[in-house]
Amino acid sequence: MHTAGADGRQFHGLMADPRIVEHHRLVSFDLPWHGKSPPPEGAIQGSWRLSTDLYVALIMGFIAAAGLEKPVALGASMSGEICLELAYRHPEAFTGIIACEACDKINQRQTAWAAHPQVNQAQFVPEWIRALSAPQSPAEYVDQIAWHDGQGGPQVFFGDIAFYSDEWDARERVGRIDTNRCRLFMLTGEYDYSCTVELSEATAAKIPGVRFLAMKGIGHFPFAENPKRFAEYLLPILAELKG
């Protein structure tokens, strides 16, 4: 599942990795208002606001419509957060869940500039998020992340961050996630200053049975900024879940 303001193109690197696709089928979808998924008919431009309940409903609806049987859920940033919610609400629906760059509450990442009528969001948003990638990540992938985020519609990124760093608050429920019903993995890049390793680790400490790992040489967009390096962390987990 893609990050804020982006779309499924973030997974092209993983989908082109023969080590992964030889044994696994990867499926990515665009949220409404993102990528190839248009806004609902009659929706007012700039009105998109993501919430926990809406996000869960969209994901579970997609799984049902696509006929996926107990998939492995993978997300980062806002989609990493919702992975925690999926583990809490629907553990029976998944073989495993991999929540990257996620914690139970993120503060101070919402920015009014992303919705200001006098600010060019196509220029502002890419620069707001560019430094979240690790310095070792290949420039071509970092540039692609910025390009994707710059193509979002008016206030789409803002509406996503309204969930990521405002509405989302799982501090009172992550401790009730049952990892006996669904195996849960949390991975966070060492260069992520939005959802830091410390924040993720503190959340993981509340969840009995979770597996937490800090990723070296990776920032906030693991599967998009450095898919080859991220695959080194992902492949052992997929092998474990498959076995």
Positions of predicted regions on the chain:
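Conserved alpha/beta-hydrolase catalytic His-Asp/Glu region
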Residues: 108, 121-179
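Gly/Ala-rich beta-loop-alpha elbow adjacent to hydrolase catalytic centers
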Residues: 75, 79, 83
